[in-house]
Curated annotation (Swiss-Prot):
PROSITE patterns: BZIP (PS50217), BZIP_BASIC (PS00036). A motif (Nuclear export signal) lies at residues 552-559. This is bZip transcription factor GAP1. Residues 53-60 are annotated as: Leucine-zipper. The gene is AP1. Transcription factor that plays a critical role in response to various stresses and reduces the stress through transcriptional activation of its target genes including multidrug transporter FLR1. It is found in: Nucleus. The lineage of its organism: Eukaryota, Fungi, Dikarya, Ascomycota, Saccharomycotina.
Amino acid sequence: MAEVDNGGAQKSSASRKKRYQELDPETRMKRVAQNRAAQKAFRERKERKMKELERKVVDLENLTKLNEVETNFLRDQLSILVKELRKYRPETKQDHKVLKYLEKHKGGAAGAGNGAATGSVSTSTRHTDLAASNANRVSKDSSILPGAKIIRQDLESFNENRHFNVTGQLTPPGNTSSSTTANSVAANAKKQSIPHSDSSDSNESKNTWNTDPTSSEDWLDDVMTSHKQISRGQSGSGIDFNNFFDEQVSEFCTKLNQACGTKACPIPQSKSAATTPLPGTSSNGNSNSPMIINDTMGDVSLNMQGNEHGNATNNLVTDPAFLSNTWDDMSPASNQHSTGGAPGFGQLGFGDNLLGNDILFSPNSPAYSPSVLGSGRTQEVYRSPAVQKVVEKENESKSVNFPFINSSLAFPGDYDNNFFRETTDLNFDDNDQDDNFTNSNDLVNDYFTTNIPDTDNSDSALIANGLVKEEPSMQTEDTFKVQNTNDMLNSSRMKETIDNQNIGEKTTKDDNEDDDEDDENDNTVVPSRDDGLLRCSEIWDRITAHPKYSDIDIDGLCSELMAKAKCSERGVVINADDVQVALNKHMS
């Protein structure tokens, strides 16, 4: 039987070989190619699967290590918080449990990192080592963990803020022996931890955590101070916004703020019409050249000049003693233009000279013109009693009297518009003015109210005795005028009475309406107009965002905007429409 089976197996193998040999070469090559393609596809699928698994493993390892770093960071913060609370309240049982929990996990983490449970590990050093070891992996594929880079930067900045000594222990800021090398060692801590991340595990047992409460408190204050300095350094341009305007972020805004003044010099320095010379001035250097009056502000100067004939009025206006704004004595140059060395307006002693040899109120002054004011007009112009006495005394001794000129005729307004009711006496005194006015009124009233008697006394006697009847006669022109005048006076009085009543009613009605409007205005909210105002920073953003920014005349644009600037508690603001017009003009 065994021989039969062996013979059958040999026959079957021989038959297969015979069938394979019977295939043509083309069919044989196709089968070989199919087998190779199948094997290649299998290997590729296997490799892709392995790579995917490896990537997942790497991701999980990174997540685990980052979680460990974050957990240790939170534990350190919790420890600092507990120690900080000791200063404000006594320690409780819960605080003690928290500290024991932190110590236990800190020791376990140190044992896992070193391969044994001996020695305590510095938490800050472990943070640096973990961040350095993860830096290479995270940098290879940053798309996997987008938050890893941010966490690593935060941890590095947290570790850099601490002061380390040579052995890696935390040093209080008040320790003078090690504070001199704190900055250099802190800068080298990061550099040394990154390249030696593999060998740092052997030195972790030498680093110990300093748990002294006093040193931790000092360290916390130092961390807060350094954090403020770092935040201030990262604010952009390094400007101290607490001491200066927040709009001083560029030279453009600094110049534009001069329109409203700065904190150092709050006086506006915008361009004004005073910087331009007045019409009719010349720039030559002769004796009639304009006098330059320096203002206390600095650069602003006012150029004024008299005419070629030396007009006394213009010289008076351009007198430095007259326009001076200082309380000091006048300089010799100023005395040359003044009358007798008298102090000008704003200078000490100006009020004393006002009653004496004043350049404005003296009859000999160029500004005094009797032909314009009139000789008897002086007392009505200057109402001060002291000035009136002085002027009257000077008029008696120096002025020329014209007996045929009455100032009341030239200026009837000062006599209450009674020009047409005055008497023909032009030389009355001021004291008799009221009496003359009363007499003139009586004469006029008698004239308008008294009937004109007849010239024929006999006719009047006959009519009075009843012997002759009075015939109706035509009204004379004078009688007609008198009646019309009386009617007009009566009608005007009635009209005034009615108008006064209407005005009283209207005033009462207007008062009631005003009260109603006031009540409505109390509940009305005034809309804000700040939406249309742009600050300097917003204007500067518009300028710098323009593609033709390099071709813009910044100085010209700033000067144009200064003329339209408005002042607010936040600095300079400009209307958005004005800004857009100026930008279109300079960017076209």
